Amino acid sequence: MGKRKFKAESQKLLDMVINSIYSQREVFLRELISNASDAIDKIYYKALTDDSLSFDVDNYYIKITPNKEERTLTVVDTGIGMTKEELENNLGVIAKSGSHTFKSENEIKDGHDIIGQFGVGFYAAFMVADKVEVVTKSIDSDAAFKWESKGSDGYSITEADKQDIGTTITLYIKENQEEENYDEFLDTFTLQQIIKKYSDFIRYPIKMDVTESKLKEGSEDEYEDVVEEQTINTMVPIWKKNKSELTDDDYTNFYQEKRYGFDKPLKHVHINVDGSIRYNAILFIPESAPFNYYTRDYEKGLELYSNGVLIMDKCADLLPDYFSFVKGMVDSEDLSLNISREMLQHDRQLKLIAKNIKKKVKQQLVSLLRDERENYEKFFDAFGQQIKFGVYSDYGQNKDELKDLLLFYSSKEKKLVTLEEYVSCMPEDQKYIYYATGDSRDRIEKLPQTELVADKGYEILYFTDEIDEFAIKMLMNYDEKEFRSVSSGDLGIEEDEKEENEQENNDNAELFTAMKEVLSTKVKDVRASKRLKSHPVVLTADGEISLEMEKIINAMPDDQQIQADKVLEINVNHDIFQSLKAAQGNDDEKFKLYTNLLYNQALLIEGLPINDPVEFTNDICKVMV
């Protein structure tokens, strides 16, 4: 047969395959291997209904052979082969899938499934090859044929000399171009990596001749290069093995082989689902966070396989952001893929899988918290901020899902506690869940604001992460108990203490007004403190914006500046208050000096910046002389 032209629509589609459909050139090998696997599967299915055929799996394989000198890459399979008519129909018409036709005409059982469905994967070879030759002999034909094409200019089919049933595809690899290195597809190591990445779990052996340096026989120090045929792929995926056969070491080895992390996983979840959509999954909860986890460079997602063939490195849609630390894979036979096999046509299937994965991860974390507290605390130390972010993000729509996974350090227990544990230990007269914010536990313990709450014997939660208070503001309450900062204006104290405090404010109203005039817009109010015992002064905040929030938001790089409504609280029982009263009306300069010093002192205690450090140090010097 002379050269024949592709149909006009086929020429356009071929151009799309070469230039547009696939995002990475290396997937051509995945497509050719998947086609080869399909060809062997077809013999298996044929043997189920044809008594004259036997199927011994040991006789079936795929072999990849690069030749750098001739710039060829050969893919051989011992599958069903193609007749002349099938060559014409399957390779002469682009997007005509022989595998799809075979599946339509044969009932597929026994857990096998043929991969191909669109009929374009073969043409991905033209992304890396100037010319492609296919020599094939069908199980249903005594003659062999060669299909040959250089791409869009057409193809030819001629008789060929081939004795064994199966197909040999030879790619004539392109010469290197300025921005494209095609030599890599002739490199044995690179080809091995591509096979392991995309086709590691193809059910038939993928073989290559591999050159290794070995000690010469009888020699102690002389080596020689030895060529050995090796099977590159794993073939049987761990997720299709019975869970009872697998040990923790098996899961750990898989975790490390797939390079999900360099540590050991803290926990694994093995999922097998046979329902409206069938899938298998192995999920891992890492022991530690990757170095870039809390940066924009980190990419979440699970490996997504279709019939054991990798189609996505990181499928982000399978995980909610708050579980982005989860590593692992999902394999399904029921995914509706697009023409490139790199994206899904419908997201309903993915949403069903993602919903179940979220549920399974939550169950595993709850189990870890309940039964392995030490390991859960190790997990929370690494990924707790992400759980808190999940409470805060999306306007708190996931807060009920995550609130029982939160841990905070307790002032009384001197360890991490859950919100449920905190509430269960609250005295009957305690109205609120109290918390204090700061850079560290040590710093929080020294805060003047904690004195009154601690003296009453109430437990205080320590918030040391920047996200903590934002998450709690979104949570609002737990078990109908509101959260209350120890720096807030109302701590829920007894009425008699309120009356005493109001009396102190009335008695010193003139002094507090004078202090407020000195500080001008720096504070909303100056008042007597009901919380201080030994410290002279403290800053608190009225309203929703706390002092800690002001500090965090103002430190962000977007130049967004906010200001909390600050209240300067004075301990009227402290000696310095008497000095302040003595200066009022008698020495205006000293009164102004003391007022500014107390305000700046309160700023320092809160970790807030002083507007004029030079003036502050000069004021200290004035007091000292």
UniProtKB/Swiss-Prot annotation:
Record Pfam families: HATPase_c_3, HSP90
Subcellular localization, as worded in the UniProt entry: Cytoplasm
UniProt KW keywords: ATP-binding, Chaperone, Cytoplasm, Nucleotide-binding, Stress response
Residues annotated as transmembrane: none
Assembly: Homodimer.
Family from the record: Belongs to the heat shock protein 90 family.
Known role: Molecular chaperone. Has ATPase activity.
Protein name, per record: Chaperone protein HtpG
Organism: Oceanobacillus iheyensis (strain DSM 14371 / CIP 107618 / JCM 11309 / KCTC 3954 / HTE831)
